[in-house]
Amino acid sequence: MVQFENSVTVSGLLHFIKSDKKDGKFFPFSIRHENLWVDGTTRKDFLTVRAFVPEVKEQLRTLAEGTPIKVHGVLRASRGSGDMYLSAERLEVLNQ
């Protein structure tokens, strides 16, 4: 049988999303990425992340907007909308 893998590691700048879900089942946030685009311009991407793990949720509450972070997790799709997001299992603060 084939073994499938679903693991994602992304780093960037922490960006908080305005949401009333921060005290609920998950803590939503995003990772800001600035990448050189094919036409030479800078593309700003905001990668959607949800933290379900209690330790990660608590860690996020102590961090400031723009903190360099690395997130380890798995890619998921929302049951309702089908939107893709990274489900954060572990978070590291990167040295500036």
PLM region spans:
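Single-stranded nucleic acid-binding surfaces, predominantly the OB-fold ssDNA-binding core
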Residues: 1-96
